[in-house]
Amino acid sequence: MNIRPLHDRVIVKRKEVESKSAGGIVLTGSAAGKSTRGEVLAVGHGRILENGEVKPLDVKVGDIVIFNDGYGVKAEKIDNEEVLIMSESDILAIVEA
């Protein structure tokens, strides 16, 4: 995939949601829901501050993140693969192993 986000934008590939309930029941369709976890595929250079400095992003390529799947998140199909384009501020947490 050849894409470079600008400024504080991040490209994320949504992780598949767990398809079984805690009781072992297989969930399908909308019952499984959409995951709000994903892997960071690309990051912009950083957020431009009021004084003109560029603040590097906290997330990096390969991070697994939890994100807010709301208004500011844009889904795009690139190379037949759906990715999400979001601002770093849409990312709520980095999952650490």
UniProtKB/Swiss-Prot annotation:
One GO cellular component term: cytoplasm
Gene3D superfamilies from the UniProt entry: GroES chaperonin
Keywords from the named record: Chaperone, Cytoplasm
Source organism superkingdom: Bacteria
Ligase listed as a keyword: no
One matching Pfam family: Cpn10
GO biological process: chaperone cofactor-dependent protein refolding
GO molecular function: ATP binding; metal ion binding; protein folding chaperone; protein-folding chaperone binding; unfolded protein binding
NCBIfam families named among the record's database cross-references: PRK00364.1-1, PRK00364.1-2, PRK00364.2-2
Function: Together with the chaperonin GroEL, plays an essential role in assisting protein folding. The GroEL-GroES system forms a nano-cage that allows encapsulation of the non-native substrate proteins and provides a physical environment optimized to promote and accelerate protein folding. GroES binds to the apical surface of the GroEL ring, thereby capping the opening of the GroEL channel.
Family: Belongs to the GroES chaperonin family.
Name under which the protein is recorded: Co-chaperonin GroES
Organism of origin: Pectobacterium carotovorum subsp. carotovorum (strain PC1)
